C-alpha cells in the first residue's frame, strides 16, 4: 500500500512513518519545509511541498491508496490570540478542505481518508462518560474540531471511507505532554491543575500507530473513532502515577486562574474534562498494548536496555590521536545499548549506515540537521551535522574509522562538543532469524572536573534518553 501523510514531521507522524514502513507500506509525506523534513523522516520516504505545485500534489494523491491527515498547529501550551486561532484553523480546516478538493479531482483517488481530530470536540463534560455518539460541545475548540471533521466528511459523497481520529493526550517520553512535564517531575516537583478532578483521556503512542493501521485494514470502521485508552484518569491521578515513575517528591496544585493569565482562552485544553472511551475500537476487536496508565508510563521511562558506566577497557581501534584516553583513569565513559529486532542483518546494516536515516531515530528536541554527507558511505567517509538543544547549537564532524559491511562500523568525532566520541555499531545475526543491534560508545567530556560534574548532572541522563528513543524507533521500524 502507498500512504500519503500530512503532518509527518510532527510528534505522531515521526512514530507512524517507521511503523507503517515495517508493514511494507511506501510513503509520500506532504510537508511545509522539505529540507527540514529530510533531516527528520529518513531516507526511505518521498517528500513533496504541501503548498507547492497542485499537479505534483494531485499526482501523489492519485498513486496513493490511503491518506493520513495529521496536520495541525500545536494548540496546547500556547496563548490563544486572534493570529494563533487563524493558524489553528488554516492548518486544520483549510488544509483538509484543500486536500479533499484535490482528491475529488483525482482519476484514481485514495480509497481511505483518515483525518486527525481530538476529544476536545466534546467540550467540557466533567465526569460524563463519552463515546463516539456523544454530543459535541459549544466552545471554540469544539467548533474548530467539528469544522475540521466536517471538512473530511465531504469525501463520503465520493465513496471514500473516512475516519476521524479523536485523539486523547498522546503519551511518549520525548514528545507531547510528557516532554513538557518530565523536567519538573524529574527534579522532584510535580503539579496538576486546579483541584485535579478533570478527566484526562490518554493513549500511548504505540497504540496510536497500531490503531491507525487497524482502521486502515478494517473496512467496517468509519466516522469518528475515539483514540483513547480504555481507562481515563483524573488529572490528580495522572500526576500521582507520573510521580511514581519519576520519583518526584512533591506534587502541588496550580490554580487554573494563573494558567488563564498565561494562556488566555487556551487554558481550556488543560482544564476541560474528557472521559472518553474507545468504544468503536473495542467493539471491533482492537487490543490495546497499554490499557492502563501505570503500564504506559513505566514503559516510557524504562531505560534498562541502555547503560552508562566508567570504561574499564581500552578503546577499540584506538588511533594515535586518542590512545591517551584509554582506560578508566582517563575518565572515559562507556554507553552500551542493545536491541533485538525482527529483521535480517543486511537490511538493518543498510538502514543504519545511511546518514539520512539518523534524524528519524533522533529525538525532535535535538533539532538534528545534516550539513554534509556523501553516499555511499565507507571507511574514511566524513559527515558534518548540527544539533541544537534550546538556544545552544553544536556543530559536529565525524569520520568512519572502521567499515565492515553488514557487520559493523565505527564513527569517531573529529570536531564537536566531546573531547572523545567513538561509536561502534554492531549488527549480529541470531539463530532465530532476528538481529541484535549493539551500540557501544566511548566518550569523554572536556573541561576536566567541570565536565565530569556536567556528566553526572545532565549529559549521562540526556544520552540515555537519546539512545532509548533510538531503540523505540528501531522497534517500530523493524517490529
Model-inferred region functions:
Residues 3-23:
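N-terminal Rossmann NAD(P)H-binding glycine-rich loop of SDR-like oxidoreductase domains
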Residues 35, 39-95:
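NAD(P)H-binding glycine-rich loop region in Rossmannoid oxidoreductase-like domains
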Residues 85-87, 97-139:
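Conserved Rossmann-fold NAD(P)-dependent oxidoreductase catalytic core, especially the SDR/UDP-sugar
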Residues 90, 126-164:
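Catalytic helix-loop patch of NAD(P)-dependent Rossmann-fold dehydrogenases
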Residues 146, 155-164, 168-199:
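NAD(P)-dependent short-chain dehydrogenase/reductase
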Residues 182-190, 198-232:
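Alpha-helical substrate-binding/gating segment
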Residues 218-265, 298, 304-315:
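Mid/C-terminal beta-alpha module of Rossmann-like enzyme folds, strongest
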Residues 305-374, 378:
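Hydrophobic ligand-binding cavity/cleft-lining segments
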Amino acid at each position: 500500500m502507498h500512504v500519503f501523510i500530512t503532518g509527518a514531521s510532527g510528534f505522531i507522524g515521526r512514530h507512524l512513518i517507521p511503523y507503517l514502513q515495517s508493514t511494507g507500506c511506501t510513503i509520500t509525506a506532504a510537508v511545509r519545509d522539505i529540507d527540514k523534513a529530510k533531516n527528520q523522516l529518513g531516507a526511505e520516504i518521498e517528500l513533496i511541498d504541501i503548498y507547492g505545485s497542485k499537479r505534483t500534489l494531485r499526482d501523489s494523491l492519485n498513486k496513493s491508496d490511503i491518506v493520513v491527515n495529521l496536520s495541525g498547529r500545536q494548540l496546547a501550551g500556547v496563548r490563544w490570540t486572534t493570529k494563533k486561532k487563524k493558524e489553528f484553523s488554516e492548518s486544520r480546516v483549510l488544509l483538509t478542505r484543500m486536500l479533499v478538493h484535490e482528491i475529488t479531482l483525482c482519476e484514481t483517488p485514495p480509497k481511505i481518508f483518515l483525518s486527525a481530530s481530538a476529544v476536545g470536540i466534546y467540550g467540557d463534560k466533567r465526569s460524563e462518560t463519552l463515546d463516539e455518539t456523544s454530543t459535541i460541545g459549544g466552545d471554540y475548540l469544539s467548533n474548530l474540531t467539528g469544522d475540521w471533521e466536517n471538512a473530511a466528511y465531504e469525501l463520503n459523497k465520493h465513496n471514500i471511507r473516512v475516519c476521524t481520529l479523536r485523539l486523547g493526550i498522546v503519551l511518549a517520553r520525548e514528545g507531547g505532554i510528557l516532554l513538557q512535564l518530565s523536567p519538573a517531575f524529574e527534579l522532584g516537583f510535580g503539579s496538576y491543575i486546579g483541584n485535579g478532578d478533570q478527566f484526562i483521556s490518554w493513549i500511548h503512542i504505540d497504540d496510536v500507530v497500531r490503531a491507525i493501521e487497524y482502521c486502515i485494514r478494517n473496512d467496517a470502521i468509519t466516522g469518528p473513532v475515539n483514540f483513547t485508552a480504555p481507562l481515563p484518569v483524573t488529572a490528580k491521578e495522572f500526576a500521582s502515577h507520573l510521580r511514581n515513575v519519576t520519583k518526584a517528591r512533591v506534587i502541588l496544585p496550580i490554580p487554573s486562574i494563573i494558567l488563564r493569565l498565561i494562556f488566555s482562552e487556551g487554558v481550556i485544553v488543560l482544564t476541560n474534562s474528557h472521559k472518553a472511551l474507545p468504544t468503536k475500537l473495542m467493539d471491533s476487536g482492537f487490543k490495546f498494548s497499554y490499557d492502563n496508565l501505570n503500564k504506559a508510563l513505566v514503559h516510557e521511562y524504562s531505560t534498562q536496555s541502555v547503560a552508562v558506566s566508567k570504561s574499564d577497557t581500552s578503546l577499540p581501534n584506538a588511533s594515535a590521536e586518542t590512545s591517551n584516553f584509554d582506560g578508566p583513569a582517563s575518565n572515559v565513559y562507556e554507553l552500551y545499548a542493545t536491541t533485538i529486532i525482527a529483521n535480517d542483518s543486511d537490511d538493518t546494516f543498510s538502514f543504519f549506515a545511511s546518514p539520512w536515516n539518523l534524524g528519524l531515530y533522533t529525538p525532535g528536541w535535538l533539532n538534528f540537521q545534516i550539513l554534509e554527507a556523501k553516499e555511499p558511505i565507507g571507511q574514511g567517509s566524513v559527515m558534518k551535522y548540527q544539533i541544537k538543544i534550546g538556544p545552544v547549537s553544536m556543530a559536529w564532524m565525524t569520520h568512519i574509522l572502521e567499515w565492515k559491511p553488514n557487520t559493523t562500523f565505527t564513527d569517531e568525532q573529529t570536531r564537536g562538543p566531546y573531547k572523545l566520541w567513538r561509536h561502534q555499531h554492531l549488527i549480529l545475526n541470531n539463530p532465530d532469524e532476528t538481529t541484535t543491534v549493539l551500540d557501544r560508545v566511548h566518550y569523554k567530556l572536556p573541561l576536566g572536573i567541570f565536565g565530569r560534574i556536567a556528566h553526572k548532572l545532565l549529559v549521562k541522563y540526556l544520552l540515555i534518553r537519546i539512545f532509548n528513543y533510538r531503540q523505540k524507533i528501531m522497534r517500530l521500524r523493524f517490529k
